[in-house]
């Protein structure tokens, strides 16, 4: 299951877009605003007790705006993307997004005592695609490295892939998506994503050892 994978993802991708975020380096944006989300999680007893409405609102407001779901879905679908119709592409993006919303929301309710350390990095003015490095530290456990693949857009930096402990989110989903498409076609993948989202499962991309 991807539950622990997405818990880590949620903790470090929960950075909202404050004023002037468009001009803020990606590592600074992540480091400074992650603290806001961690504070909310620690103080909001309703979310800690599983209030899904509030959790969904937090995910929608502070986590998902930092993703480029179109690019992420295109990369996850891979070689099958060009032969999908415009309607199928939109459905794939929508259903993939819905699945991640539910997965992130469940992960938020499992937040406990993890802390985050962002690694120093140097970004040149001309850089448009970077990797932000960080570590999740857990009491009694080894640090877990997390890398964020981000690119610069007209609306600030966006995440298009995350690698946790050498496991790429996009690559994981690509393998699962490709298998489903071979068996059931693109419409079959859309149906599978919708079904998994509706029942709240994160089965499409099992993490090794989880």
Give the location of each predicted region.
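Short loop/turn positions at the edges of beta-strands in beta-sheet-rich folds
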Residues: 15, 138-140, 154
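Low-complexity, intrinsically disordered terminal/linker segments enriched in charged
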Residues: 161-210
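Solvent-exposed loop/turn segments at secondary-structure junctions
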Residues: 81, 98-99, 123, 137-138, ...
């Amino acid at each position: 299951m991807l539950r622990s994978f997405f818990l880590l993802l949620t903790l470090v991708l929960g950075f909202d877009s404050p004023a002037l975020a468009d001009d803020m380096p990606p590592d600074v944006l992540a480091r400074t605003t992650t603290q806001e989300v961690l504070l909310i999680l620690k103080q909001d007893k309703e979310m800690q007790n599983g209030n899904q409405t509030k959790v969904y609102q937090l995910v929608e407001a502070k986590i998902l705006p930092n993703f480029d779901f179109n690019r992420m879905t295109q990369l996850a679908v891979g070689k099958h993307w060009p032969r999908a119709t415009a309607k199928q592409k939109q459905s794939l993006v929508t259903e993939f997004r819905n699945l991640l919303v539910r997965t992130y929301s469940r992960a938020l309710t499992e937040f406990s005592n993890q802390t985050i350390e962002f690694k120093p990095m140097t970004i040149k003015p001309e850089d448009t695609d970077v990797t932000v490095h960080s570590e999740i530290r857990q009491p009694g456990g080894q640090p877990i490295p997390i890398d964020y693949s981000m690119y610069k857009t007209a609306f600030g930096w966006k995440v298009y892939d995350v690698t946790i402990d050498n496991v790429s989110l996009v690559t994981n989903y690509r393998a699962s998506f490709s298998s489903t498409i071979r068996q059931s076609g693109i419409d079959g993948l859309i149906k599978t994503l919708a079904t998994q989202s509706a029942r709240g499962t994160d089965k499409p991309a099992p993490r090794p050892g989880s």
